[in-house]
């Protein structure tokens, strides 16, 4: 859904979608953002400065709160509150809705936002850089055995990561298990016997309780658990469809091929906790 015209360059943007904020930062157009949600600020801390309005979240925000920022463009994920969209459009404000499912969709979103804010050339550069970084990783893992990888974006219920994450897992040299974005059960995941488990829960950062989920789900017989290959990746690196996915890919590559890629800061392995616990007990 879009009401953006090609002959207009917005100067006051309200971001209700974190990925849009990250994309605008990559485009060098963060100065156009006059208001955003707290989740946008979480993934893009730079937006907290400059006196910008912080809206609680996109689903509880009222149109009057959004319009109070005097935007000429509102960017949100769709489907969105139908009533709010109608009121925004009635006020003469342009609305851009994002609903990416694949990496190709994300590239299109970057190009669309770049075009809307007068940064088309920069947008193409951002896209090209993403594609080049993904291809670098793909080439490094070419010919290696693909490990079975289970990635989830939520734990109760168990929901597999989105399709773009499945594409990143493949690029990192893994075999994505299950259906992207689908709900599953602990028993069905155990039956697939993943060799690597990655948890990136929405809104949890890198604080997923890995030991607890293994214990509660009775996954001890799983290959990934026996080998200590259970990881948490900060959710913004995988769940935010923006240029930062490249860092998520690097974390996935380190989880799948730890001997070939350095472990980034926002990748945590269940064995890391065990090492700290053992060291504490020996003191």
Question: Where in this protein do the model-derived segments appear?
Answer:
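N-terminal ligand-binding lobe of clamshell/alpha-beta domains
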Residues: 1-283
